[in-house]
Design a protein with these regions (language model features):
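Terminal-region recognition feature
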Residues: 1-122
Length: 122
């Protein structure tokens, strides 16, 4: 599904504004703001984070993914500001590609997962 690019005005007052470490405290703030935005057609989530707990990021992301599937008439948008590191990029990955935006100058950090290679000798 191709969505139109949102104009700048759509980001004036984000429904969800998060900053700091991705942790259970951030999740609580996220859920409170997310629940308060239940009537909004466009729900902008504006995080800035240097990282944190990837499993908490996945919990927030699953909330976004589930709401996107259950309420297709609503649009859930990510607007990264300043820094989106580590767990922040995990969270961003749950938003549809056409709903991922970054403010000018925002930095992303994406970790490469290295798997050890174990040889099995027969």
């Amino acid at each position: 599904m191709q969505l139109e690019r949102l104009p700048s005005i759509a980001f004036k007052s984000p429904a969800i504004a998060l900053s700091g470490v991705v942790d259970y405290e951030m999740y609580t703030k996220f859920r409170t703001q997310f629940d308060n935005a239940s009537e909004e057609k466009i729900v902008v989530t504006e995080p800035s984070t240097l990282g944190g707990d990837p499993e908490v990021a996945r919990m927030m992301g699953e909330d976004i993914r589930f709401a996107s599937e259950m309420e297709p008439h609503r649009r859930f948008v990510f607007l990264g500001k300043a820094a989106i590191y580590s767990a922040g990029t995990t969270f961003m990955s749950f938003f549809a590609r056409q709903n991922r935006y970054l403010a000018r100058g925002t930095r992303l950090m994406i970790h490469e997962r290295k798997l050890s290679k174990k040889l099995v000798v027969l």
